[in-house]
């Protein structure tokens, strides 16, 4: 019987998602049965986890590629093994937990605050300077990443989002405006790295139009990969690094 698994994603049909479809293709070449399970095509009932009208069966493994909610947790319960392990995954999808827990001699953490948009503007500026960056705790692909340049742009957070929403406020690293590094790590080994560059946006997300170019996997990057794996136990991950004055 072939090894069976689920990729947890947004939809069953991830037509334009290269990574998901490539994983399915490679699994098939290895005689593995890998199915994309979309959260928005799934519901959890007392009878089981139902996807497109069918109860999902237990499988050998799941690949977690969706961050939010509890449906993904129910799908993970059907598997013998989760990549990444669910407990660690649920912790480290949160940007605050990342800056609070992760450390290495090979990188620095920007100054940060956790709070809502009801914090006095002056108190944040006093701690972080101006401009500063506001980040949604579980956002991705550049969404909910805002550069706060003045009080008016800070007040837009309260206008555009619930006042109860927590934000990670970070100091603005000007040396990294419109550029950063993204490297990929598999069980503590850095396997690839790229530099992302944006024209006219402080964010360097490919989803927002940034260009990419190869970047060498340096000894420092290898150290970061090993340190983060030791601290998290995450099997695979993409790690973003800013350029700074010192590191």
Placement of each model-derived feature along the sequence:
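Generic beta-strand structural signal
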Residues: 114, 185-186, 243
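Short glycine-enriched loops at secondary-structure junctions
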Residues: 67-69, 88-89, 189-190, 196, ...
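Conserved metal-phosphate-binding beta-hairpin within the catalytic cores
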Residues: 228-247
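Conserved N-proximal alpha/beta basic substrate-recognition cap immediately N-terminal to
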Residues: 10-114
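A generic structural signal for well-ordered alpha-helical segments
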Residues: 27, 75-76, 102, 125, ...
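Phosphate-binding site of ATP-dependent enzymes
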Residues: 143-231
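Active-site nucleotide/adenylate-binding loops and adjacent lid/helix of ATP-dependent enzymes
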Residues: 2-9, 56, 79-80, 87-178, ...
């Amino acid at each position: 019987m072939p090894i069976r698994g689920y990729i947890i994603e947004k939809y069953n049909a991830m037509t334009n998602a290269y990574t998901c479809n490539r994983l399915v293709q490679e699994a098939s070449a290895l005689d593995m049965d890998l199915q994309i399970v979309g959260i928005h095509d799934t519901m959890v009932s007392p009878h089981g986890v139902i996807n497109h009208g069918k109860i999902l069966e237990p499988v050998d493994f799941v690949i977690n590629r969706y961050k939010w909610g509890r449906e993904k947790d129910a799908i993970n319960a059907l598997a013998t093994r989760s990549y990444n392990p669910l407990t660690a995954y649920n912790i480290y999808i949160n940007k605050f937990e990342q800056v609070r827990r992760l450390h290495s001699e090979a990188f620095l953490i920007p100054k940060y605050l956790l709070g809502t948009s009801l914090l006095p503007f002056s108190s944040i500026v006093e701690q972080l300077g101006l401009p500063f960056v506001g980040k949604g705790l579980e956002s991705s692909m550049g969404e909910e990443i805002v550069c706060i340049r003045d009080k008016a742009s800070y007040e837009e957070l309260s206008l555009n989002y619930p006042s109860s929403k927590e934000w990670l406020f970070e100091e603005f690293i000007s040396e990294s405006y419109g550029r950063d590094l993204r490297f990929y790590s598999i069980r503590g080994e850095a396997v690839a790295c790229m530099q992302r560059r944006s024209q006219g946006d402080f964010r360097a997300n490919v989803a927002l139009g940034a260009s990419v170019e190869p970047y060498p996997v340096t000894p420092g990057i290898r150290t970061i990969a090993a340190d983060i794996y030791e601290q998290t136990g995450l099997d695979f991950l993409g790690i973003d690094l800013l350029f700074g004055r010192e590191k």
